[in-house]
């Protein structure tokens, strides 16, 4: 997900996106723990997307 796409979203949409990403991260962690995760790069992508969303929420809160 690109930062520019996220910047166009409202705070409510960003909070929803963050919740979805956290759920996805949990599911990926469970798959990795049980040995079912084939695409290990997805956990890194999700972690970075979470950081992007949190950064934008902080920016919007300060503005």
Swiss-Prot record:
UniProt-recorded Gene Ontology molecular function terms: structural constituent of ribosome
Annotated Gene Ontology cellular component terms: cytosolic large ribosomal subunit
Superkingdom to which the source organism belongs: Bacteria
UniProt keyword Ribonucleoprotein, yes or no: yes
CDD domains: Ribosomal_L29_HIP
UniProt xrefs under InterPro entries: Ribosomal_protein_uL29 (IPR050063), Ribosomal_uL29 (IPR001854), Ribosomal_uL29_sf (IPR036049)
GO biological process terms, semicolon-separated: translation
Keyword Thylakoid: no
Record SUPFAM superfamilies: Ribosomal protein L29 (L29p)
Annotated keywords: Ribonucleoprotein, Ribosomal protein
Pfam families registered for this protein in UniProt: Ribosomal_L29 (PF00831)
Family: Belongs to the universal ribosomal protein uL29 family.
PANTHER family xrefs: 60S RIBOSOMAL PROTEIN L35/50S RIBOSOMAL PROTEIN L29, LARGE RIBOSOMAL SUBUNIT PROTEIN UL29C
Protein name stated in the entry: Large ribosomal subunit protein uL29
Species: Yersinia enterocolitica serotype O:8 / biotype 1B (strain NCTC 13174 / 8081)
Gene: rpmC
């Amino acid at each position: 997900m690109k930062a520019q796409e996220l910047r166009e979203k409202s705070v409510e949409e960003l909070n929803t996106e963050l919740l979805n990403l956290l759920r996805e991260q949990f599911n990926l962690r469970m798959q990795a723990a049980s040995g079912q995760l084939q695409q290990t790069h997805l956990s890194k992508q999700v972690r970075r997307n979470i950081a992007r969303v949190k950064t934008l929420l902080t920016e919007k809160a300060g503005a």
